[in-house]
């Protein structure tokens, strides 16, 4: 792996020394409303240099840890299956090397490629999802590989009771009916996350964390393809990240920043800060991981 010309701030470790490997999937070909998430990874890297590596929230510095930024994958925008296969291959390589794969999207469909790799190594995988949308449609306009269907496709891999969703405030009736039978859905906020995390810690099951940034309220994060009013605050998301990363997290992703949809740059700055805090929270917990 070769580093990108411009890496995320503080992610300057070599691949050999790294415990976490950051890789980008600039893909948004199934976006159903406003495109632009393909530009998210590059924008986050570029704007990160306006951010300190030190986190006053966690009293830790990114430079205290070993993170390697491998840059973006070259993905075929005309083929979702091809793009997912490339994402899966990179995640599988990182997992095989005993490292933690952290995927930077892109639209939420990219999660499926990473989960495919994770479930090969961890058949008992659980998924924790922070999102405004249920993403449980069986198809969207006839397409089964869509960001509106990503958690439904993940459910086909991990089964009932293994998907735990938070902040959900949008979806059609069929999605909510499906969730009532097959997933654990917490609407609107992070109520129940502490209790779930305690259960996951006690059972020591492997957990994949997927964060769709549209879980945030659009008043602080308007730069996303499908904004939904009524979301959580940055501090609520940070608290949730610090809570859930005490579980046995074995892979993660951060997705759905569409930087061109917020010309103020606030959304990109927020995404940078979320990524910094996520990296630190994950790396602080690394000795407890069962990779």
Q: For each predicted feature, which ranges?
A:
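Conserved alpha-helical scaffold segments that buttress catalytic/binding sites
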Residues: 1-291
């Amino acid at each position: 792996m070769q580093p990108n010309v411009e890496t995320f701030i503080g992610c300057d470790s070599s691949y050999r020394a790294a415990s976490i490997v950051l890789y980008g999937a600039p893909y948004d070909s199934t976006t159903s409303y406003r495109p632009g998430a393909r530009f998210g990874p590059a924008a986050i890297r570029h704007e990160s240099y306006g951010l300190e590596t030190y986190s006053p929230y966690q009293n830790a510095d990114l430079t205290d840890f070993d993170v390697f930024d491998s840059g973006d994958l070259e993905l075929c925008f005309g083929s979702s299956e091809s793009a997912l296969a490339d994402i899966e291959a990179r995640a599988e390589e990182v997992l095989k090397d005993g490292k933690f794969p952290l995927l930077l999207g892109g639209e939420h469909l990219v999660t499926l490629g990473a989960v495919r790799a994770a479930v090969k190594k961890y058949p008992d995988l659980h998924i924790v999802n922070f999102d405004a949308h249920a993403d449980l449609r069986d198809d969207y306009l006839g397409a089964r590989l869509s960001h509106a269907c990503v958690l439904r496709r993940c459910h086909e891999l991990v089964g009932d009771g293994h998907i735990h969703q938070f902040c959900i405030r949008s979806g059609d009736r069929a999605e909510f009916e499906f969730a009532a039978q097959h997933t654990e859905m917490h609407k609107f906020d992070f109520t129940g996350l502490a209790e779930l995390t305690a259960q996951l810690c006690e059972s020591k099951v492997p957990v994949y964390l997927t964060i769709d940034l549209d879980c945030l309220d659009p008043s602080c994060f308007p730069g996303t393809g499908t904004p939904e009013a009524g979301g959580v605050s940055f501090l609520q998301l940070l608290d949730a990240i610090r809570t859930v990363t005490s579980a046995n997290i074995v892979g993660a992703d951060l997705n759905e920043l569409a930087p061109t949809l917020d010309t103020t740059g606030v959304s990109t700055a927020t995404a940078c800060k979320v990524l910094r805090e996520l990296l630190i929270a994950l790396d602080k917990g690394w000795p407890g991981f069962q990779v």
